[in-house]
């Protein structure tokens, strides 16, 4: 058997008839399957034991030889070899066809490969193959031409006229004859000659033919093998037949299809033996051809063959295609043992790295480990009795189970796994009941809630797997989100509310202004009711265990609240004491205004101070990020647990509730509405008098109601009590937002109708008063639209992620430094005057390409190839530098991946990226995962003269698929000055641009909004009108880098507009994959075919060789491919076939005799090899063996002692 981890490549090609026979273990001659009386396979039938192997292990068909001792014996009575029944999954058979049959993939695919080789149209081929016309195979001395089509009548006429002077035939036989006569060398040379002069359609056809000819020539495939003489029969276990209750059988469709082929083949043999008339034989041959077509690809030609209930039968091609096909169902997504799933419930008392595993589940998952331990401890004599003990649930197994699961991490996964944080490792603790307990802080990463979600558990078995799970995947390690490097484990809901309540300040609370000597005294006073959590008090600063206070401050009093004293106990001692939610306090120190001398009148001082805001969700996130930066993983995860516990505790103590009394009504609401009604009335009057158009009226009415709603909202906020539970919930960021509150207590406002147009009748009621019937009806549109939109969006976003993963799955960090001398110059991304992504954020975690100096002092801020940290990035921006050249994935020279320097920092860990990191997949997940948060609709920019601007998910798809954008901007092909803008015919505008040596004019439709005016200086490729630039047009007038920069900025605009932050490097990795190919224009003296799409690296390599040998290099132009197209154009046919268009990819690969070098992840997963990323990459695999050798020696020594 082949060792799965030990082969280098996989090759695919056409099989010759001899090859098919050499695979086969015998010919299938009968269409029978199983004898229905004995339930044994029929001899020479589709399940024959003599051909395919025995049904039962080590037992021949007739029962003469049983038991393993006869291994390898071939029974003399029934001819079955005594072996394992598993061989029925791998032994193939064959059918000797009575007449050659064409393979539908090569004849019917687009373009028809057979047609290109023979230089015939697919239409003509079809007539020949299905016996409608004759084709001349040998014209002899007659005036007929080779490959000329003859109808039945013409054939008879010529036969009478020339007798046997020529030969013509029908069906696949004739095709085979023509194919075997083709001289590939001669044809190739002729085509190359033709290319030198041919133009237009002829040239295109010649190039396509040349491509196929070269493929056949180079791969060693013979064109005549596209016609089958022998048909392989796949192993019976792969097309099984199973008995259902009631004695009926269920069988795979393939058996029906094979049966049809065998029946027709046998009938044809009989007809030929009988010497039947030609017309009957021809009809039977046609039927055989159709049967084989249906078997290979049912439904590709004509009506599909149907089974019971008019259901088309699934052919061999269908077995590979689609989500249920072999590739995606069984090779890329396998079900695994040692796994289980159950409902999740919250485990608030768990540590960050723990999860609760139900006892029954743990016992089943760790069964083998428990059995081994039971035998090891002598509690069971052998494995069998250990198993019995477990099944009986003997009491002693629980102690053993506890021991076994200690420090054995398990993986928890929640579907849909949108990013790598969808699978994390935890240490299991046993819990009663049947639900998995999940730590509340990891819910954000999993996007889990406890309304019935389920999660799956997997057990890593080997020592290496456990080590990887513990070191790389433990939940306590996954604090940062890979997409932007911000903490993903921020407290939510109750935890936020608790910490918000804890850090609130209240005027004149109980015991305000009391002075305490230390925290304990303050807490004691709080517990006895002398002070409140919210009371502002003074504490002797020296008693607080904080290392950041200065000596002077230690001798002073610190003005704070009891709640803040408690809150600060969860932070590390060397972290600033947090007294106010400001950046200064977080990053530098506690502001000195909170320290007063011991002689101060504390009460008067406090009374004069403003109240400080409590700590909201965002601040808690910033605290976590700061702690992570300064103290790293372990300390942060401990601090998070303390924050969680404190939040829950205080939240419980505060006893927040929501009642109808908390929803206050607004006195002024009636007035505001009256005023609005009056204004609307005036607007309507103006419209009736014809002073404004209907559109203007509509826009103004909507503006009036929006203003009214905003006014009510503003007044509501002012009238709210800061301690109102609903206000606290939304202000802290625990749940809800201000618009929810406005709808409860103010007015609901305007709603959209099903088409998305805003209904101008506002809903003036709120939920506390209740809606009228009409208002309720108007509201239902919006509610339904929301739900349907979400459902559609999820599917779209998932498909986008799938395409992104596919195009970038082989991008891995391959080396430390690629040594490139190019870089990417970056500045802040802007939309008009608004900054979308500041320079600071773009710089952090990247390597500088050139030395960066301060523009005035000339002092070096960062050297060439230095990592730009947050501090350096701030320095650069403060020095007033606006653009910086950095190393980027765009300019990286690494083949099949990126190097460490061009990629920069790994956002998920905050440290340098490791060689072997699968950055392509991380990039795809980072862009795809927030996809569900993007909006679906195409926005209408208000006003009459507005183009539709696509935003949200559709815009992201438009960019990555490189489609022509909606609302396309007109770009200039020359750089220079706009000399005139004139109005032309049909109210069009004509813009004229004077370049240095060229003058161009552009006609602009009158609906477009201009971005330039007379005298503006424009560069080549700059947009003249508002809208999106078509990147394909941009690549024609500018260089690749400009297109890459443009795409990067556009993607960032969409995500940032929706408030989603994504690291630039992820977008860079994806965009780079779209621009990997080059289209060859002139081949020079190389042996590349013109018009070929090839990888830039391969192209450069071929040119280097040409230049070194002194010949003419090829020229090409870079091509921008959409992600779907780029995935299908990858060098790996396994990866492409498992993505989309399976049959087309495989047909192409087989003709070219392609080799899959197994560089990406997908192809290795398909073959069951270790993926070449992470610890599976070459350099780490070599390490392993050496380490193992050492440990082996050590163990020997131990045993000797």
UniProtKB/Swiss-Prot annotation:
Documented EC number(s): 2.7.7.6
Catalytic activity entry: RNA(n) + a ribonucleoside 5'-triphosphate = RNA(n+1) + diphosphate
Binding residue positions for Zn(2+) 1: 60, 62, 75, 78
GO cellular component terms given for this protein: DNA-directed RNA polymerase complex
Cofactor note: Binds 1 Mg(2+) ion per subunit.
Residues the record lists as binding Zn(2+) 2: 818, 892, 899, 902
Residues involved in Mg(2+) binding: 449, 451, 453
Keyword Heme: no
UniProt enzyme class: transferase
Keywords tagged on the record: DNA-directed RNA polymerase, Magnesium, Metal-binding, Nucleotidyltransferase, Transcription, Transferase, Zinc
Cofactor(s) demanded: Mg(2+); Zn(2+)
GO annotation (BP), single: DNA-templated transcription
Pfam name, any one: RNA_pol_Rpb1_5
Keyword Metal-binding belongs to the record: yes
Oligomer and partners: The RNAP catalytic core consists of 2 alpha, 1 beta, 1 beta' and 1 omega subunit. When a sigma factor is associated with the core the holoenzyme is formed, which can initiate transcription.
Family: Belongs to the RNA polymerase beta' chain family.
Descriptive protein name: DNA-directed RNA polymerase subunit beta'
Organism: Listeria welshimeri serovar 6b (strain ATCC 35897 / DSM 20650 / CCUG 15529 / CIP 8149 / NCTC 11857 / SLCC 5334 / V8)
Native organism taxonomy: Bacteria, Bacillati, Bacillota, Bacilli, Bacillales
